[in-house]
Amino acid sequence: MKEFKIYLELDGSQQHNFLYPLLFREYIYALAHDYGLNKSTISLETVGYDNKSSSLSVKRLITRTYQRLQRIHLSIYANDSNPNHFIGHNNNLYSQILSEGFAVIVEIPFSLRLVSFLEEKAKEKEMAKSHNFQSIHSIFPFFEDNFSHLNYVLDVLIPHPIRPEILVQTFRSWVKDASSLHLLRFFLHEYFNWDSLITPKESISIFLTSNPRFFLFLYNSHGYEYESIFFFLRNQSSHLRSTSSGLLLEQIYFYGKVEDLVEVFANDFQDILWLFKDPIMHYVRYQGKCILASKDTPLLMNKWKYYLVNLWQWHFRVWFQLGRVHINHLYKDYINFLGYLSIGRLNTLVVRSQMLENAFLIDNAMKKFETTLPIIPLIGSLTKARFCNPLGHPISKLTWADSSDSHIIDRFVRICRNLSHYHSGSSKKKSLYRIKYILRVSCFKSLVRKHKSTVRVFLKRLGLEFLEEFLTEEEHVLSVIFPRALFISRRLYKGRVWYLDILCINDLVNHDKFEILSN
């Protein structure tokens, strides 16, 4: 990463082409092909930003990864019986390798910008670097503290895909590198249907599976662009500007939201700022969805709704349907976000009071923000993964029959604990218990079918230790603390628990990718 900084610290006359020379470095492609790095964006603490990192260990990692890739490519070439067939796909192979390396390179300036932003915030507020805000679970306590006094929520599905040329223009406003812009346009030609107004979903799926890092970078750059305009209008229309959520957003998302915007926005949108006078407003985005919560009338929420539709249609040239934006009442409609169903509740508390000889009752309405587990999508995910039928009845996992007993149990336990860990914040644990029951019985049936036995005989042979494998860490700890008072531990376990160590839960939230959990 020291070489990265050398390229980024060039003088003004050379800084316009700081990305292009990195394309000729072999270690860039070694890093791009490393499977550990492909699962997520580059971590700031593991690639050289931390002073404690060893440059020698990084060089060894790059060399080892590069040698492994050479062996993989040689084995593919040796096992291919048709050399012409292999040569015919060289162009696609080279394009794939180049795009993966390019995805690593374009992240560098934004990662350095994020580091400098966090350092400035730490100096201003004299606060230590906290990793708790990186957790996805930190959003829900924020909901509980701030959403209880709000009324309406604007539930938005962010439109995709967008026109490729819009992505190029967005990237052009950040990086003054003509060579990189031409290369980006070339990659978009490869993956997208350039002639159509709306990109087909097949191109998106191919792009996402072939180069997820590059796809996520383009998606986040698109999100940054419209959020910059949105936050600008939000700050200009309110005298009570929010400062508490700035650091939270910066640490959750890899790409920082820069506060300096072009002054032309003020000239273009000055006439419509009076439409959005709302001092209490909260915005949260994750993956392809965002929510906008406010304490105001439905009229104002409708204005925001049509503003967002016009912004995407006219500024980003995206066909946006009104059905992708829903105005929900916080205390009447559920909000499906981050794998939870959230809703506000009004709990009435009756208090008897007496003053002198007169006694009267006072009804206090306590507002509470509840989060529950969506059982139907999870049942559907288990059905797709062949753990149960559409009715939720457990079935055996036939594809794992060739594995050893310990390996089968370990895979079931891992899925069960991951789901319990993430959904521990649910207000009602009955749905979570049902999911755990399906996985436990499916494990029984898979082992029974493998050994051609019955559930009763097989369970008697394994004993109760087999059931303890499915206990979560919380249940183990509570059973140790309260070994004799089991009812106390069960009562404590029924409470909601939010964890601040859950950083990457894409596969847990996205029910269509449930099968990935078992790998």
UniProtKB/Swiss-Prot annotation:
Pfam families: Intron_maturas2, MatK_N
Entry keyword set: Chloroplast, mRNA processing, Plastid, RNA-binding, tRNA processing
InterPro entries listed in its UniProt record: Domain_X, Maturase_MatK, Maturase_MatK_N
GO cellular component, one term: chloroplast
Localization of this protein: Plastid, Chloroplast
Molecular-function GO terms, alphabetical: RNA binding
Main location: plastid
A biological process term (GO) from this entry: RNA splicing
Family according to the record: Belongs to the intron maturase 2 family. MatK subfamily.
Function: Usually encoded in the trnK tRNA gene intron. Probably assists in splicing its own and other chloroplast group II introns.
PANTHER family named among the record's database cross-references: MATURASE K
Protein name: Maturase K
Highest classification ranks of the organism: Eukaryota, Viridiplantae, Streptophyta, Embryophyta, Tracheophyta
Gene coding for it: matK
